[in-house]
């Protein structure tokens, strides 16, 4: 439509324009209705009359690129800009202590929502105090406070440093993305909004302001009644908590970080007890005066609206406790006494019953791979060779465990010297990559594992060839290289499968195929560990560890075997429904290839073809309902007993695994699933039509059969 046609249409509409659900009264320019819409009819038509034919409407701050980007992501600003009225905030007004306390809690809640995936435009930037600092150039952010006057009020002394500290914490997280230590949502970057995160603001000045706030509040608290004193002490605790979080984010040294984390764990329960001091009316008043939920209309570019439900202030502080627990957990990794323990620790870190926030995951990567070393101790090559030595042993004339180096190259036969160098280089990259990607979010972790699988396959071929060379030289015949690389390969396949289930990539009617494939891989891995543990050439300490891994794998395998029977039973009883369109042969083949394509073309382990999986499922379907219930009950009972035995016994060889063994938490969650299923199977054995369904229990890795 041309500009001339547009003007004609606008003129024909004049006098009948309706803004929102309100018919604007003539001469009522600037009227704001209950929904927050502003009557701009008169100004709008005056502006359109000034247009000429073929003239483009543009604004120097809104470029063509911005408009295209906004259109592509369905930017709400395209619709909200014309009716948006910026929030007018009087920053010179001195807030009461109760209002400051409420604002602190709301800002912390918004900060945690950002850490867990909400866009800045729906979380932190909605705070007028945060927004006012972020949109100002760093050169204009001093230390005087929010108000422009010469005098500093309580809000400037107390709330201003707190807000600065929150933004500075976000800046530190933001820098982790810029350095490539994290890969999550793009809009985590403040650059997307052309705003500042106080990148160059001196942290020394910030510490001084926070300390001044504490001294000011300490002098004020003695002046007031017990009720107001409780509020001021609550503010003091929140400032001290922010100092502790800032210390953790700085990563100065391990002792300082651990002390700060213990401070956080002590302060959060006290703060949680004072959250209820602020009633709902105060919160609503604060939100109305200092919170702009439509702030995206002021931003140059924003991420698509996600409308992630707010978690609430109480849960936000619970998330801070999670943060402290997770950080203490990864700091334990520096106490691990062996290279194989580091590898196992990182794998187990991916099995936490919640996804740690981004900074925790980047801290794990920073701690494990800092200074081009693994766990601040081994160079990458020696780390990889130590893993092999601890798992299956290495020939004494090949590797020196005292110096952690390969023997001199001139003593390695020229027949397989290049093969040794190729395998060491290849395997080293794989092991370091595995440690690194364990810190990624679950979706990226799975994708990176799939990308790494071909590299592991090549390394496995090289390891087999090298082991044959050693056999020809009358060296140990248990294949030390190929045994360990094959173990790593099976670990990768298992985590690819398990993470696909955790991310709900399989529909319930596809679960039998999934559990059949997983059971097949577990069986191969179980056999590999069993044979390796019995090999006479495996060192005694390695045998102990491999035997323990075998017991863990056996307990996990029995659990998932029980789920294979359980899903077939649920489909029989119509607890899991099968859509009719999925019965088509081509659709079934397409589903199978989509889920298991990375595994289909592997030579080792031999993949489970769809025809073989169908045969396994069909054999189970031939059982009667009662037989399926009995067999499921037997499997889950065996799994429960195995899990209890492994959890109780633990692993006593601290040379390999430290007392904080993450695997135990995962096994406990599997045990909960087994017990829940056993209770439901007992109900089904008495009444096949019992009202049961598959439910997901928070924290458990698998859904369970339970009452509706």
Swiss-Prot record:
Among the GO biological process terms of this entry, one is:
protein maturation
**Which GO cellular component terms are attached?**
cytosol; NatC complex; nucleus
**Where does this one sit in the cell?**
Cytoplasm; Nucleus
Going by the UniProt record, its keywords in alphabetical order are: Cytoplasm, Nucleus
Identify the Pfam families for this entry: Mak10
Please name the PANTHER family in this protein's record.
GLUCOSE REPRESSIBLE PROTEIN MAK10 (PTHR21373), N-ALPHA-ACETYLTRANSFERASE 35, NATC AUXILIARY SUBUNIT (PTHR21373:SF0)
- What protein family does this chain belong to? Belongs to the MAK10 family.
Role according to the record: Component of the NatC N-terminal acetyltransferase.
What protein name applies here? N-alpha-acetyltransferase 35, NatC auxiliary subunit
| Organism expressing this protein natively | Schizosaccharomyces pombe (strain 972 / ATCC 24843)
């Amino acid at each position: 439509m041309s500009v001339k046609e547009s003007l004609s249409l606008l003129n024909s509409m004049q006098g009948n324009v309706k803004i929102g659900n309100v018919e604007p009264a003539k001469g009522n320019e600037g009227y704001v209705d209950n929904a927050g819409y502003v009557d701009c009819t008169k100004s709008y038509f005056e502006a359109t009359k000034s247009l000429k034919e073929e003239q483009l409407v543009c604004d120097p701050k809104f470029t063509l690129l911005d408009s295209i980007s906004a259109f592509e992501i369905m930017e709400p600003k395209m619709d909200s800009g014309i009716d948006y009225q910026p929030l007018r905030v009087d920053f010179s007004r001195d807030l009461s202590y109760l209002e400051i306390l409420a604002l602190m809690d709301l800002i912390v809640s918004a900060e945690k929502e950002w850490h867990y995936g909400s866009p800045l435009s729906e979380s932190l930037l909605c705070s007028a105090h945060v927004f006012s600092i972020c949109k100002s150039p760093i050169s204009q952010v001093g230390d005087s406070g929010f108000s422009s006057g010469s005098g500093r009020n309580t809000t400037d002394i107390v709330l201003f440093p707190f807000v600065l500290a929150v933004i500075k914490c976000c800046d530190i997280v933001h820098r982790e993305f810029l350095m490539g230590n994290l890969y999550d949502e793009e809009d985590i970057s403040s650059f997307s909004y052309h705003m500042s995160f106080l990148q160059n603001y001196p942290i020394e000045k910030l510490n001084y302001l926070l300390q001044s706030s504490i001294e000011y509040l300490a002098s004020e608290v003695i002046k007031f009644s017990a009720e107001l004193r409780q509020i001021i002490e609550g503010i003091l605790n929140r400032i001290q908590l922010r100092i502790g979080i800032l210390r953790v984010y700085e990563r100065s040294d391990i002792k300082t970080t651990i002390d700060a984390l213990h401070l956080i764990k002590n302060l959060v329960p006290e703060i949680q007890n004072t959250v209820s001091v602020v009633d709902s009316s105060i919160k609503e008043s604060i939100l109305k005066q200092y919170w702009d939920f439509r702030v995206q209309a002021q931003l140059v570019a924003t991420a698509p609206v996600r409308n992630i439900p707010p978690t609430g202030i109480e849960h936000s502080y619970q998330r801070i406790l999670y943060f402290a627990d997770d950080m203490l957990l990864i700091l334990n990794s520096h106490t691990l006494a062996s290279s194989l323990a580091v590898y196992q620790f990182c794998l187990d870190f991916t099995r936490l019953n919640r996804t740690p926030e981004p900074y925790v995951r980047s801290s794990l990567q920073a701690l494990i791979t800092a200074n081009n070393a693994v766990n601040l101790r081994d160079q990458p090559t020696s780390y990889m060779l130590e893993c092999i030595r601890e798992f299956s042993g290495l020939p004494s004339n090949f590797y020196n465990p005292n110096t952690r180096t390969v023997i001199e190259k001139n003593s390695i036969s020229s027949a397989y010297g290049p093969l040794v160098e190729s395998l060491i280089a290849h395997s080293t990259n794989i092991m370091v990559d595995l440690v690194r990607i364990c810190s990624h979010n679950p979706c990226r972790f799975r994708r990176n594992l799939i990308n790494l699988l071909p590299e592991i396959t090549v390394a496995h071929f090289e390891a087999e060839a090298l082991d044959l060379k050693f056999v020809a030289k009358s060296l140990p015949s248990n294949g030390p290289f190929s045994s360990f690389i094959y173990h790593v390969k099976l670990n990768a396949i298992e985590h690819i499968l398990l993470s696909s289930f955790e991310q709900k990539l399989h529909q319930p009617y596809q679960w039998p195929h999934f559990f059949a494939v997983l059971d097949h891989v577990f069986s191969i891995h179980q056999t590999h560990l069993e044979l390796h543990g019995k090999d006479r050439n495996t060192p005694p300490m390695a045998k102990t560890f491999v035997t323990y891994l075998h017991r863990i794998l056996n307990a996990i395998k029995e659990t998932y075997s029980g789920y294979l029977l359980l899903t077939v039973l649920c489909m029989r009883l119509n607890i899991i429904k099968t859509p009719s369109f999925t019965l088509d042969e081509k659709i079934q083949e397409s589903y199978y290839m989509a889920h298991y394509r990375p595994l289909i073309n592997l030579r080792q382990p031999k993949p489970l073809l769809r025809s073989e999986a169908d045969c396994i499922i069909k054999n189970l379907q031939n059982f009667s309902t009662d037989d399926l219930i009995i067999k499921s009950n037997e499997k889950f009972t065996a799994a429960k007993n195995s899990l209890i035995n492994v959890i109780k016994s633990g692993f006593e060889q601290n040379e390999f695994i430290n007392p904080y063994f993450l695997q135990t938490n995962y096994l406990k969650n599997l045990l909960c699933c087994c017990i829940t299923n056993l209770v439901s199977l007992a109900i089904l054995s008495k009444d096949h039509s019992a009202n049961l369904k598959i439910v997901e229990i928070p924290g458990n890795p698998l859904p369970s059969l339970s009452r509706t």
